[in-house]
Amino acid sequence: MSSYKYYDLIRRPVITEKTTLLSEQNKYTFYVDKLAEKLAVKKAIEEIFKVKVKKVNILNVKGKKKRFKGVIGRQVDRKKAVVTLEKDHNIDFAGGIK
């Protein structure tokens, strides 16, 4: 698989208070493509960030119902991947921020 497909597979990192606490345990969370599988996510993370992945957990997140100007709508469904890295590896999302 080419590196372009890896970048299409991993949408963006999920940066919240909960995921920040998980990163201390070497667990990082990403939104991934709806058709992504564990093995493909593992290969993509290893190729993009040059780290060693220990385990991948996949979650399907259902979209919430929302109201906008009196019209009831729904957010899109998403897929999240929680990636556990090996002990000596980490990902620095805020590397250039000072």
Curated annotation (Swiss-Prot):
UniProt cross-references to Pfam families, sorted A to Z: Ribosomal_L23
Domain of life: Bacteria
Lineage: Bacteria, Pseudomonadati, Pseudomonadota, Alphaproteobacteria, Rickettsiales
Protein known as: Large ribosomal subunit protein uL23
InterPro entries: Nucleotide-bd_a/b_plait_sf, Ribosomal_uL23-like, Ribosomal_uL23/eL15/eS24_sf
Gene source species: Rickettsia bellii (strain OSU 85-389)
Gene3D superfamilies for the chain: 3.30.70.330
Family: Belongs to the universal ribosomal protein uL23 family.
SUPFAM superfamilies, sorted: Ribosomal proteins S24e, L23 and L15e (SSF54189)
Main function: One of the early assembly proteins it binds 23S rRNA. One of the proteins that surrounds the polypeptide exit tunnel on the outside of the ribosome. Forms the main docking site for trigger factor binding to the ribosome.
Keyword Nucleotide-binding assigned: no
PANTHER family in the cross-refs: 60S RIBOSOMAL PROTEIN L23A
Keyword flag Ribonucleoprotein: yes
GO BP annotations listed: translation
Gene Ontology CC terms, in alphabetical order: ribonucleoprotein complex; ribosome
Keywords, sorted A to Z: Ribonucleoprotein, Ribosomal protein, RNA-binding, rRNA-binding
Subunit structure, interactors included: Part of the 50S ribosomal subunit. Contacts protein L29, and trigger factor when it is bound to the ribosome.
Molecular-function GO term, any one: rRNA binding
